[in-house]
Amino acid sequence: MAQNITPESLISILAAALAQKPTKPLVLALDGRCGSGKTTLADRLTRQFPASIVLHTDDFYLPPAQRVRGWEKTPCANMDLTRLRDEALRPAYEGQPVLYRAYSCRAGAYQPVQELAAQPLVILEGSYSHHPLLAGYETLQVFVTCSREEQTHRLQAREGERYANFSARWIPLEEGYFAQYRIEETADLAVDTTAANACAGMMCR
């Protein structure tokens, strides 16, 4: 099981690693339970380390027409992890600029090209970011979690009337992915955001 640390300890670890002036970017991957605060933690880290870029797995959903039959019951089947790896993660890991088009589920379309300059710290955040297809391009894997009760409270606040459907559809897929690939057990570190101040007064995302 990964060692549990605080967000402050993670900041210290990253600061020490970056102070060594590594020859390649440090790629931090934040995976974990929905509502645990992965995006909130990534936002905090980018404020702490301005020379960084953030890649969101949410930008790499597959368009519905490209998803296999029965994808709703298969972990990761709604994600285009190959495109994430080839267009964004691999170039960032190699210290190259990143050019990619996010897919918007809300709009049902690809968005204009985004260009991100190479930076010494790359933060990949979102569900499925520790998938074996991506792991070879990651320096440090951190699993972000919270208690079941706190997760329910946060998701109800975030999703509102959509919570019941969200909980029935996405949480089982996510937990299946964690179990299939032993994501929580194999992470380098873990951050538990259950404590009330873990998200610094912001809604955890």
Question: Which ranges hold each PLM region?
Answer:
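NTP-dependent small-molecule kinase module
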Residues: 1-21, 118, 136, 140, ...
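Short hydrophobic/aromatic beta-strand immediately N-terminal to the Walker A/P-loop
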Residues: 27-29
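P-loop (Walker A) phosphate-binding loop of NTP-binding proteins
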Residues: 33
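Conserved lysine of the Walker
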Residues: 38
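Hydrophobic positions on the alpha1 helix immediately C-terminal to the Walker A/P-loop
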Residues: 41
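Active-site signature of alpha/beta-hydrolase-fold catalytic machinery across serine-
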Residues: 44
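Short beta-strand-centered segment that lines the nucleotide-binding/catalytic pocket of NTP-utilizing
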Residues: 51-65
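Conserved nucleotide-sensing/catalytic segment adjacent to the nucleotide-binding pocket
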Residues: 65-110, 121
